[in-house]
Each structure stands twice: as structure tokens, then as C-alpha cells.
């Protein structure tokens, strides 16, 4: 998956939905259909990128979340897994959480390179502020995703810009042949950036919002001003702010702050992106899209119906047009060749000549609708369970003795230890009923 050679003329379009929300320690609401665009059949989404800030990070909550999935991750997996989305990766630093979900057919073409946390609170020692990053390869292209929470208050604009630079500086992925983050094909950067509206008073800002006169407010938005003066920040693009400022609201209402502080509304919650600069582009010219890799914004909006926080969530929907650098998976699993004997199921698979196999690779058996790679019902270590190997065709056996008789469909996934990713996935199939035991109460227990 390290080759940069274009592999065939056929292009591919991926639809990506990005969400940022400062949830102010609240539990998930009952319904996220609007935020996740679940009822919009025209979107046909491929990937969800979800960043949350200010998750409950009390000591009891953190200890519980270390042993189990946090309530937001569990809720999102429950919502998205029936739609064939699988949690690909996540990273959390105290109250800052980043999650990536993808349709299962894309898994063999997503390689997780690294996850990283950069604390900037308390002089860089505390993770209540800072950024978290997932660095991955998507169909052979380098993509970095950053969720951040920058310092608050209108007077801390310079500190926000310093933290922005600090987070970017610390996000370089470790490993051979991984380019500097600024040489990645795409950076998606979002979060509670906390930029405020300068100069204008509270009454003027609220009246402008009431009359939907946002143009004058854009000119005094601190992020918009900074982009005019900072060459690197200028390379990050953003959609037009055609929605009301997303902070600060009274909870469970659409009323801006009525407390004694009466904070001035601001567009604190933002979604930015940056495409790799092409050699022909100068430092002061817009970045032209590469002919084989381009990103377009389909929609950028806030979601005013949610009131659990003093922030409103923001989403951006993108179309990523790319010409895959990787056109075939590293592993091909062949359920049509599986057969059973006693309590075991034999699985055949083939690998590419350059696949870096490891004895610690494993093949998982999953029910269709899995939430993440740990939801297997059985598995086999490739190094321990391989029974034959010839002409690049391998066979392993998987224990199915604890799987009750069912008409459910299953999937096989091959997990590469060295690549830290699923590198092969089978089509759905059913296991012949005679191969499964009839006790409906038995369930396989994960061993890893």
C-alpha cells in the first residue's frame, strides 16, 4: 500500500460527513438523525468523521471509559452499524474525542498510520485543550484528521493562533516513508476553535443575527482576520458561514446567553480543510486541485434543534474525487471456498506478493452489522491456525463450536498487526446450519 503509482483509469467518489460539537459534558441525545443526515437518501455517505469536545472527563467517567466504550462512542456505533458503518479508528485526550467510521467495503483501502494527542493546556501538560489526530492512508493517499479545542475568551486570540501552530507542528506521523503533515494529500481540521467576533458590541451582534445579516460579522471574525495575515492558515479553506453563530446558548433553547455574563455570540465551531500544495502554486495563490485528487464542499451548516449544550453542532459534507493508488486489497478472503469439519471452519485466502505478513495477524468471523473490529464472534491467529500454503493460497481454521444455529449472515476480516488495519474483508455469507450448534444461549467470548 506504499506505492504512489496510479492503478487504472477508473476514478472514485467518496462522500464524507464531518461533525464537530462541544457537548459540554452532556450525554448523547435520543436522536441524531438530523446531525448525521440519516434521512437524506441522496447523500449516500461513505465516511463519517466525528469530533467532540468537552466530553465528561471526571475521574470516574475516565476510569469507566478506559475499560469500556464511552457513552458517545457506543451510541454512535449503535446508530451507524445497522447502516454498514464500522468504527475504523478513534483517539481520545480527556474531553476531546475523534472517531472515524467507514462503510465496510472501504476497510481494506484504509490504513491507520498513527493516532496522536497534543495537549496545550497548562503549558502543554494538560489535555483539556489541544488536539487529537488520526493519520491514515485512504486508497493510497495520505490524510490527516485533527479535532481541536483551543483557548477561550476574546482576548486570547494570539494564544489560539499559537496553539494552532503548536498542534500542527506536533502532528507529524512516526514511521518510514510517511511525509510531513503539510505534504499530506488532505488535512481536515475542525473543532471548538473558540475564535470570536471583535469590535462589535453585544446588541449589534445579536441584531445582525436576528436579521440574518452575517456579512458584517464575518469581517470581524478573528479566524477570518487571521487568515488574511497568516500564509499557512490561508492555505486552509472553509465554507461560507451562512448559519448563525454557534455559541453561546442557554441549554435546551435557541436563545443566546441570558446569564449575567451575556457572552457575545461567535462562530467558535469550525471545519477547515487543506489540500496538498501543487508545485505550480505560489505561496499567495489558491491551491489548485490535483487532477487525480480533489475535494469539494457540498454543505456546511449548524444544527439548531440540539439543545443539550451551550454550543450548536456544525457539520460539513464533502465529495472527495480520487483516482485510487491502490486498486486491489492486500488480502482476498474466499468464503466460497470455506468448508467445515467437526467444530472448525476452514477459510482460504490469498495475499499480494508485497504483503508484510506477521504471525500476530488474525482473521475474525463477524456477524454482518459489526460495530468495530473487536466485535468478532470467533477468530484465529494466522500463525497458529494455518494448515496449508501453496501457490500463494493459504488456509486456516476458525473455531465455530460456540456459535448457535442462526440464519444471520457473516463476514470475515483479516487484521494486519504490522499495518494496524483490516486489509481484507469477505463478501457476506451464511454458515451451513449443520455446522453450528443448536444451543441458542451460547455466545463466543473474545479472547484478545
From Swiss-Prot:
Residues 16-318 are annotated as: Catalytic. InterPro entries: Endo/exonu/phosph_ase_sf, IP5, IPPc, SKICH. Its main location: endoplasmic reticulum. GO terms for molecular function: inositol bisphosphate phosphatase activity; inositol trisphosphate phosphatase activity; inositol-1,3,4,5-tetrakisphosphate 5-phosphatase activity; inositol-1,4,5-trisphosphate 5-phosphatase activity; lipid phosphatase activity; phosphatidylinositol phosphate 5-phosphatase activity; phosphatidylinositol trisphosphate phosphatase activity; phosphatidylinositol-3,4,5-trisphosphate 5-phosphatase activity. It is linked to Muscular dystrophy, congenital, with cataracts and impaired intellectual development: An autosomal recessive form of muscular dystrophy with onset in early childhood and characterized by progressive muscle weakness. Almost all patients also have early-onset cataracts and intellectual disability of varying severity. Some patients have seizures. Belongs to the inositol 1,4,5-trisphosphate 5-phosphatase type II family. This is Inositol polyphosphate 5-phosphatase K. The gene is INPP5K.
Amino acid at each position: 500500500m506504499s506505492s504512489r503509482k496510479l492503478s487504472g483509469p477508473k476514478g472514485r467518489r467518496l462522500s464524507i460527513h464531518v461533525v464537530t460539537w462541544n457537548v459540554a459534558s452532556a450525554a448523547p441525545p435520543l436522536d441524531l438523525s438530523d446531525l448525521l443526515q440519516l434521512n437524506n437518501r441522496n447523500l449516500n455517505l461513505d465516511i463519517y468523521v466525528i469530533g467532540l469536545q468537552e466530553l465528561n472527563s471526571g475521574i470516574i467517567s475516565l476510569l469507566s471509559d478506559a475499560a469500556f466504550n464511552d457513552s458517545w462512542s457506543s451510541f454512535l456505533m449503535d446508530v451507524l452499524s445497522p447502516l454498514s458503518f464500522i468504527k475504523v479508528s478513534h483517539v481520545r485526550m480527556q474531553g476531546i474525542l475523534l472517531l472515524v467510521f467507514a462503510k465496510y467495503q472501504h476497510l481494506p483501502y484504509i490504513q491507520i498510520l498513527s493516532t496522536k494527542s497534543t495537549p496545550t493546556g497548562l503549558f502543554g501538560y494538560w489535555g483539556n485543550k489541544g488536539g487529537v489526530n488520526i493519520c491514515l492512508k485512504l486508497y493510497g493517499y495520505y490524510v490527516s484528521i485533527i479535532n481541536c479545542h483551543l483557548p477561550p475568551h476574546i482576548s486570547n486570540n494570539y494564544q489560539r493562533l499559537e496553539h494552532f501552530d503548536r498542534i500542527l507542528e506536533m502532528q507529524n506521523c512516526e514511521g518510514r516513508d510517511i511525509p510531513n503533515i503539510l505534504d499530506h494529500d488532505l488535512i481536515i481540521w475542525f473543532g471548538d476553535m473558540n475564535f470570536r467576533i471583535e469590535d462589535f458590541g453585544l446588541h449589534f451582534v445579536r441584531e445582525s443575527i436576528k436579521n440574518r445579516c452575517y456579512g458584517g460579522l464575518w469581517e470581524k471574525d478573528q479566524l477570518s482576520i487571521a487568515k488574511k495575515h497568516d500564509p499557512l492558515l490561508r492555505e486552509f479553506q472553509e465554507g461560507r458561514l451562512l448559519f448563525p453563530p454557534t455559541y453561546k446558548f442557554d441549554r435546551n433553547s435557541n436563545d443566546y446567553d441570558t446569564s449575567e455574563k451575556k457572552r457575545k455570540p461567535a462562530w467558535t465551531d469550525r471545519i477547515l480543510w487543506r489540500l496538498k500544495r501543487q508545485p505550480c502554486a505560489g505561496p499567495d495563490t489558491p491551491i489548485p486541485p490535483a487532477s487525480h485528487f480533489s475535494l469539494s464542499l457540498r454543505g456546511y451548516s449548524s444544527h439548531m434543534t440540539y439543545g443539550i449544550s451551550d454550543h450548536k453542532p456544525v457539520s460539513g459534507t464533502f465529495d472527495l474525487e480520487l483516482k485510487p493508488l491502490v486498486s486491489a486489497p492486500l488480502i482476498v478472503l474466499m468464503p466460497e471456498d470455506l468448508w467445515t469439519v467437526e467444530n472448525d471452519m476452514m477459510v482460504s485466502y490469498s495475499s499480494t506478493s508485497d504483503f508484510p505478513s506477521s504471525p500476530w495477524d488474525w482473521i475474525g468471523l463477524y456477524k454482518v452489522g459489526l460495530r468495530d473490529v473487536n466485535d468478532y464472534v470467533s477468530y484465529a491467529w494466522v500463525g497458529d491456525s494455518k494448515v496449508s500454503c501453496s501457490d500463494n493460497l493459504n488456509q486456516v481454521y476458525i473455531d465455530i463450536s460456540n456459535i448457535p444455529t442462526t440464519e444471520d449472515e457473516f463476514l470475515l476480516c483479516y487484521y494486519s498487526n504490522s499495518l494496524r488495519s483490516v486489509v481484507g474483508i469477505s463478501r457476506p455469507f451464511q454458515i451451513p446450519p449443520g455446522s453450528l450448534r443448536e444451543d441458542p444461549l451460547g455466545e463466543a467470548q473474545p479472547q484478545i
